[in-house]
Amino acid sequence: MTIATPEVANFPFTTWQPTPGMMPIENIQVQLIDTPALDRDFLEPELLDLLRRTDMILILVDLQSFPFDQLETSVATLEQAGIIHIDRLDHYPDDRRWYTKPILVVVNKCDDETQLEDFKVFCELLEGGWSCIPISAQTGFGIDGLKQAVFDRLNIIRVYSKAPGREADETSPFVLDAGSTVEEFAGEVHQDFVAKLKTARLWGSSDFDGQMVSRDYILKDGDVIELKI
């Protein structure tokens, strides 16, 4: 999924320190960090801090080796650090501070049709609120679906800048939070553009190409913006 080269093996506890890598999703790069297993007696404070600051958590379980136990142990470890799945917030008391994160359960070793049937059973037996993605690291099955699921759950959009009289550069989008406005996009292009912005024209989600839009117009994924200052 990334060009990182952590040590891998067909047994647990291979990863001993966080290893970053960049995962391409269409025309953007998303950083993934391979962490040590969470089912250990001691977790370094640096690792817990990393987990609290991340935008999203992927819990990898082995379908062929007690996946329920793996998930339960990982979730319990995260709970001890105050980290919970944002879709399961109503399962927890509101008398403490929680770090809420979107969490995907990535189920590895779905290598053939038999394992895919086991995956379906695994999902059916889980309590509500969990999103599970089947993959096979051996065959590559499900990797594209996982990438799309990560993009969707990050809740981000890609917006392209266009200079007057030129075509938009669609190779290097600006990545913004979903719900971002034209004004927020201008600030990402350059901090001075917010105060100096006179007009903005939009191609994409507008009623017609090149439509003038206001500063508070909410952008959509794939929009092209031409700013005039």
Label the predicted regions:
Residues 9-10, 44-47, 212-215:
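Short beta-alpha junctions and helix-cap segments that line functional grooves
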Residues 13-20:
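Short, glycine/charge-rich beta-strand/loop segments that flank catalytic centers
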Residues 86-229:
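C-terminal-of-GTPase-core extension/linker across diverse P-loop GTPases
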Residues 1-7, 16:
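A conserved segment at the C-terminal end of the G1
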Residues 22-30, 40-134:
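Conserved C-terminal guanine-recognition region of P-loop GTPase G domains, centered on the G4
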Residues 34:
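Conserved active-site aspartate in kinases
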